[in-house]
Every structure is written in structure tokens, then in C-alpha cells.
Amino acid sequence: MNALQRLYWYYKLKGSPYRPLFASVQKGEYVSLDCETTSLDPNRAELVTIAATKIIDNRIITSQPFEVRLRAPQSLDSNSIKIHQIRHQDLADGIDEKQALIRLLNFVGNRPLVGYHIRYDKKILDLACKRHLGFPLPNPLIEVSQIYHDKLERHLPNAYFDLSLDAICKHLDLPQQKNKHDALQDAISAALVFVRLTKGDLPSLNLPYTR
């Protein structure tokens, strides 16, 4: 969302509790976010879980995470269950989508969103927010795989880089995920990559897969 769009929504939401979302972005604070959904197509996907963790002054606040499970959507089928291992019975106590979004906005505020394939998550959340609340998320996006690629590309132009989250974490000597396709684990992994790449040393350039 550009500055003009942000200003438009800021004035349109006068008197709304959501107006501060479109004010100036907080500096030094970020939120790493991930969603589990029912499809890889953002126009068809429905939310299953949403998880996030704050990054404040380069510290990942894992002691106060955000995590919600939604009611099982109609499109939750065997194909999506194979990916994230979340079944209908696992969502028996899930909350409705609008309530989940309200909780998420209270947690995130207008902080930039960090993530792995974060544009996919943002697209789905935008569609849901427009449907229930009437506006898209204003949050700037930070893609950790792009930061990783750009840092290495400057020193190893035309090399091949494995941009999977597991490969990035392994190369950066970060903890490997125990549960793949777990929203909170993915959010924490993306946060670790972000802090490592923005505040740590340059990653090792001795890559077995460069060419």
C-alpha cells in the first residue's frame, strides 16, 4: 500500500477504531506472520490457522506469540490436510474468521509484516479483511527469501541459491523446524532469518550448490 492509499484510508476511517492502522508505521518493530490455508491459490484459499510473533529491537518475542485456529472451512479437504496435517476435529474449538481477524489486527497494529512467501499470506488476509471489515491490511511487507537472495547475489552473481525455508535456515545455522507447515513454527523461523540477515554477519559464501 503506497502513501496515497494509506492517506485515503486514514481519512475514510475517521472515527473508526481501525484508523490508527493507517497512521505512520512504528519504527524498530515488526511482526513475523504465517497462515495455514486450504489452497495454494490465494483467490480460493480459506484460512485454517494464523500465527505471528513480534520482533522488537531485534528481539523475537516468542514468549507472547499470537496463534488462532479458525472453524473448519468448507474447502478443508484431504488434499490440504496432507499438507498441514490439520483435520476437521482439530478445529472443533476454532473461532470464526472475523473474530480471528480482529484479534490479529489488535496484535499486529501497523507494524511491517515479515515472512516467507509473505505476499501470499497478505493476499489472503486482504481478501478476508475486505470481506469482514471493509478495508485491506496497510502493513508493509518484508520477504525474507528476497533479503537472503539479494545479500548473496551481490557477492555471487549468477549463482543458484536454494530459497526454500529449510535451506535458508540450514545455511544460516538456524534451528530447523520440527513440525513443517506449522504456522507458528514458520513465523518464528522467518523471524530468525530476518534478524540474522539484517543484524548478523554476512552468510557464508561457501555454498555447495553455487555454479
Indicate residue ranges for each PLM-predicted region.
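Conserved non-catalytic scaffold segment of RNase H-like nuclease domains
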Residues: 3-31, 36-126, 130-131, 135-139, ...
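Acidic, divalent-metal-coordinating active-site segment for phosphoryl/phosphodiester hydrolysis
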Residues: 182-193
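Short alpha-helix plus adjacent loop in nuclease-associated cores
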Residues: 142-159
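The feature marks non-catalytic terminal segments
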Residues: 198-211
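Active-site catalytic pocket residues across diverse enzymes, especially alpha/beta-hydrolases
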Residues: 129-132, 197, 201
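Short, glycine/acidic-enriched loop or turn micro-motifs at the edges of active sites
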Residues: 37-39, 146, 189
